[in-house]
Amino acid sequence: VEGVQLFNIRGKNAVLPEGIPVLDFSGEVPDLATSEAVVVKTIPEDITLLKAIFQKQHFSAVYFKNDIDKAYYLTGYGTREQFAKLYKTIYQFPEFDIRYKLKDLATYLNIQQILLVKMIQVFEELGFVTIKDGVMTVNKEAPKREIAESQIYQNLKQTVKDQEMMALGTVQEIYDFLMEKE
């Protein structure tokens, strides 16, 4: 067979094929130097790790499971309204213990917790808040800045785009995407 065979095993009940090395970025990455085939079990938050593997080595068969630990493609990267609502809410509290109150805040704002954590990291990066020992304090003197100035925000936007491709693209689109040079 010429080229590469691509298999979609993204379904919940799909079983991993036996005897084929498994790329699981939540653990140790296997040595693939002599492998003709590979199973992509999990997707790293930084897709360049996966791209590097694919561009370095030619596989004749690829099985895409594509489990995503933190599904930012489902939460999005935070709308202007969500950021505004978060700011208005935390502005009312001089100190906010995010170790114990994060879940309540997520529920109150109706924002998934994984996204809320990123949004708070963006605020911290931009100097809107400081976090010390799990306590978040609003910097009321912070100069006005655009959310887009944040590197964390830019990375999150890219992660959402990459995850959408890995979760929703066809196996051919995914393979082509992984083979694209940056």
Question: Where in this protein do the model-derived segments appear?
Answer:
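Structural alpha-beta junctions
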Residues: 2-6, 33-34, 52-63, 110
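A short, well-structured beta->alpha microelement
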Residues: 2-34
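Long, low-complexity, charged/polar intrinsically disordered regions in eukaryotic proteins
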Residues: 39-76
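Short amphipathic alpha-helical interface segments
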Residues: 77-103, 107
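Short amphipathic alpha-helical interaction segments
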Residues: 110-125
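A short, conserved structural fragment
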Residues: 124-135
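Minor-groove-contacting beta-hairpin "wing" of winged helix-turn-helix DNA-binding domains
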Residues: 135-141
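Short, amphipathic alpha-helical interaction segments positioned at domain boundaries
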Residues: 142-182
